[in-house]
Amino acid sequence: MVDSDGFRPNVGIIVANDDGRVLWARRAGEDAWQFPQGGVEANETPLEALYRELREEVGLGPADVAVLGATRRWLRYRLPRRMIRRRGSRCIGQKQIWFLLRLLADEQRVRVDRVARPEFDRWRWVDYWYPVEEVIFFKRQVYRQALQELSGYLQADDWAGTGTEGGPAAVIPPAARRRLR
């Protein structure tokens, strides 16, 4: 699904541990590392896509994490020209709602091999700002924007708690709860 401007709706997923370090995953068969992310399907909310992609890409379910926050609006990046497909619907980039999650489960629950064709083949914990300089160049600005906007949730007083005080709706902006058509 591509919107009228040529951007594919997508969710970006930042999973943080108790030390505030974030899950960084290597794309299968490549020397490219990134946060988990994935497309939002028709008639699905970004929040629903978050949980589906979380299960598919790193093997975690809703009980394994707490949603700490989400970006207030869609963040966009453009693909380099050489990566734009010439056939089918013309996708020029991605628009993403980013979620910051706290890992509640033991880190051994993180599994990148739970699907037939895994997106990732390795993962590790890195410092919060590390991904900004290490992700592929065309995603850097969006990573910087998402990490900046969500960084306050790591410094919140409830970090030692579950992060779910008030329930998910308390930290999920309307854009992340709207069903895509």
UniProtKB/Swiss-Prot annotation:
Q: Which domain of life is it from?
A: Bacteria
State the span of motif (Nudix box): 38-59
Matching entries from Pfam families are given as: NUDIX
Q: What class of enzyme is it?
A: hydrolase
Q: Which Gene3D superfamilies match?
A: Nucleoside Triphosphate Pyrophosphohydrolase
Key words of the record: Hydrolase
Recall the GO molecular function terms of this protein's record. pyrophosphatase activity
UniProt-listed InterPro entries: Nudix_hydrolase (IPR020476), NUDIX_hydrolase-like_dom_sf (IPR015797), NUDIX_hydrolase_CS (IPR020084), NUDIX_hydrolase_dom (IPR000086), RppH (IPR022927)
Q: What CDD domains is this protein classified in? A: NUDIX_Ap4A_hydrolase_plant_like
Q: What PANTHER family does its record include?
A: ADP-RIBOSE PYROPHOSPHATASE (PTHR43736), DIHYDRONEOPTERIN TRIPHOSPHATE DIPHOSPHATASE (PTHR43736:SF1)
Known role: Accelerates the degradation of transcripts by removing pyrophosphate from the 5'-end of triphosphorylated RNA, leading to a more labile monophosphorylated state that can stimulate subsequent ribonuclease cleavage.
Which family would the database say this protein is a member of? Belongs to the Nudix hydrolase family. RppH subfamily.
Query: What name does UniProt use for this protein?
Result: RNA pyrophosphohydrolase
Identify the species of origin: Halorhodospira halophila (strain DSM 244 / SL1) (Ectothiorhodospira halophila (strain DSM 244 / SL1))
